[in-house]
Amino acid sequence: PSPGVFTVDAWARGHIKQELLKVGWPAEDHAGYTPGTPHEIELAEDGWTLRPYQRKAVDIFSEGGSGVVVLPCGAGKTLVGAAAMAETKTTTLILVTNTVSARQWRDELLKRTSLTPEEIGEYSGQAKEVKPVTIATYQILTAKRKGEYAHLALLDALDWGLIVYDEVHLLPAPVFK
């Protein structure tokens, strides 16, 4: 490596960036992300288009490969997520607060993208479908069985190219550090 450039193991990236930030040294991470399993997804802009601020959010995400979208209720965060899915064209895990949200995401994806019902799975207390686009609840992922996060381990083992955290401020921090 060049002077002033450090190489770290992939598993340590997040921890190192957190520690550097704590001491006032934000890290510039150029490692990027793994692309995940390819899966064709297109926006079905039939009679609608993304609003300029939604398009801007998707463009910024595409340039950096990650991001947090903060918009008021009703401003179309789900559409931004769908557009990010269409940009990445990869398998996607969407984490939501409850089954009502899961079904709202499913309905919007079916209405606003080229995805079919066969491509979208629900992974919750009521259903255990793992598909190229899987919508799971935080609750099922944090459920322990014999001291283990069995559902989290199952979904973590898959090659997701994109993970969408809906209502990220409600995310159970001890599990998703």
Pin down the residues of each PLM region.
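Conserved pre-motif I regulatory segment
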Residues: 35-70
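Interdomain "pre-motor" coupling segment immediately N-terminal to P-loop NTPase/helicase cores
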Residues: 1-37
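Conserved RecA-like ASCE P-loop NTPase motor core of nucleic-acid helicases/translocases
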Residues: 91-98
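Conserved helix-turn-beta segment of the N-terminal RecA-like "Helicase ATP-binding" lobe
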Residues: 99-126
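SF2 helicase catalytic motif II
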Residues: 139-141, 148-177
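Conserved motor-coupling elements within RecA-like helicase/translocase cores
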Residues: 124-134
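Walker A/P-loop
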Residues: 63-88
